[in-house]
Structure formats: structure tokens, C-alpha cells
A protein has these predicted regions:
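Alpha-helical transmembrane segments within multi-pass membrane transporters and channels
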Residues: 42-81, 224-225
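Alpha-helical transmembrane segments of multipass membrane proteins
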Residues: 8-12, 33-37, 60-64, 86, ...
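Single transmembrane alpha-helix segments in multi-pass membrane proteins
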Residues: 1-43, 64-71, 209-219
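Helix-loop-helix "hairpin" substructures at the membrane interface of multi-pass membrane proteins
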Residues: 43-51, 57-62, 112-189
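Structural signature of hydrophobic alpha-helical transmembrane segments
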Residues: 1-4, 44-54, 120, 193-201
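Transmembrane helix-bundle core of multi-pass membrane transporters
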Residues: 69, 73-137, 163-166, 185-194
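Transmembrane alpha-helical segments in multi-pass inner-membrane proteins
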Residues: 175, 185-226
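Transmembrane alpha-helical core residues of multi-pass small-molecule transporters
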Residues: 30-31, 54, 80-84, 122, ...
Length: 226
């Protein structure tokens, strides 16, 4: 469910014609931020909201590097990958923060009706929302148009830069949610969480039939690829 949740957001980014290899570092930092807020006594639900907002903000930073500083998406997100992972170690000195909250325990290890993992339900809801958005909304059509040809989309009146911001923010938001699930499953905030898994989501998305150049692919394909 961790990779599945993150791959859902990455699908939107790659359909746009972008790339994001920083997802697991975003997830790692989200987990560390969750641990820091929990250790500081912050309300559990406020903590979850702030962690997701952090994910959105990091996605905006990625888009800024690409759109405004004209850095290649691969290089920009790879740079963020190393910066964020380094920050995880610096901010905590490599220490773990153990979570003893029933809310976090239920997110990571709880089951609905005694059989269905709650984290699997989170993943399913995200896929349903993004499937609907990509198939039936103007935003979804614009993402496919941009993925097909950025210049043609710009000439058609689509704000390609703004669309890139949205795509990367969705990707990093899903990464942050994946980081929340990963941290809750481990029952601890760990600075090295997700290390070495940076290409897992990209592999799943491409196995699901999404074109690396963008513009072709479906959410269902990614789900199968997982």
C-alpha cells in the first residue's frame, strides 16, 4: 500500500510528461516531520494535516526548480532526493522517534471489519479520486494534453507551468501520505525509512503501461503494475 499510494501521485506527474525520483525522500522527511511533531506533543490529526501540507510544499519546490530555474525534471528531483535525505539525518542526528498513538497505530496496522487493512482503504480511495479526476475533469484532460505535447498544449491556451506545479504537488502529497503509512507501520519515525526504494514506484508505473514521455497511460494500469 505504501508504494501503491505513492505510485498513484507519480502517475499524474508522469502522464504530464514530468518525472519525480524524490518521492521516497519526501516520504522519509514526512515521516521524520511526523515524529518531530508527535514528540513535541502536537495533536495527532493536526500532525497528519501538517505532514500532508509539507508534501504539497515540497512538490511546489520541485516544480519551482523545473519551471522557474529551468532545471531538468530528473536532475531537479534527484537533487531534492539527496537534499531531503540528508536533512532527515541532520534534523534528528539519526535518532528514532517511537509512536505510541492509537490513531497512528490504526493507520499503519489497523483493520476494518477485522480483515481489510486500513492503509489499503486509504490507497483505494486515492486511486478512485485520481481515476475520476484524470478521466472526467478538465484537469485530467489538460494533463494528458500537456503530456502529449507541451508546446501544443501551451498554444491551445493551457498554462503548462501551472499544470506542472499541480502535477508535482499531487506527486509529493501522495509521497507524504505514503510516508505517513510507512512510519505508522514501523511504529517509529526513522531517518533511513525508504532508502534504496527510490525507483520502485517508477518501475510500477512503467510496468502498468504508462509512456515515459507522458500523455499515455491510466491509473488502472499503475494499480496492476503495483
Amino acid at each position: 500500500s505504501i508504494q501503491g499510494t505513492m505510485a498513484a501521485g507519480l502517475t499524474v506527474c508522469m502522464l504530464f510528461g514530468g518525472m519525480d525520483v524524490s518521492q521516497f525522500s519526501v516520504a522519509g522527511l514526512a515521516g521524520m516531520f511526523l515524529g518531530i511533531l508527535y514528540d513535541a506533543g502536537c495533536n495527532d490529526y493536526v500532525t497528519l494535516l501538517l505532514v500532508m501540507l509539507l508534501g504539497v510544499a515540497l512538490g511546489a519546490v520541485n516544480a519551482f526548480l523545473i519551471c522557474n530555474l529551468k532545471i531538468s525534471p530528473m536532475i531537479a528531483t534527484m537533487g531534492m532526493q539527496f537534499v531531503l535525505r540528508g536533512f532527515c539525518y541532520i534534523a534528528t542526528n539519526g535518532a528514532y522517534v517511537y509512536l505510541k498513538s492509537p490513531v497512528f497505530d490504526f493507520i499503519g496496522n489497523g483493520k476494518v471489519f477485522g480483515a481489510i487493512p486500513f492503509c489499503l482503504i486509504i490507497m483505494a480511495v486515492i486511486y478512485l479520486i485520481l481515476w475520476y479526476v484524470m478521466k472526467y475533469t478538465k484537469f485530467g484532460r489538460n494533463v494528458y494534453a500537456c503530456g502529449g505535447n507541451h508546446k501544443a498544449a501551451q498554444l491551445a491556451g493551457i498554462n503548462v507551468s501551472f499544470m506542472r506545479y499541480k502535477a508535482h504537488m499531487i506527486s509529493s502529497l501522495c509521497a507524504a501520505i505514503g510516508g505517513i503509512i510507512m512510519t505508522c507501520q514501523n511504529t517509529a519515525s526513522m531517518c533511513n525509512a525508504g532508502e534504496g526504494s527510490d525507483m520502485d514506484c517508477i518501475a510500477a508505473v512503467t510496468l502498468g503501461g504508462l509512456a515515459l514521455a507522458g500523455g499515455k497511460g491510466k491509473m488502472v494500469g499503475t494499480l496492476i503494475g503495483i
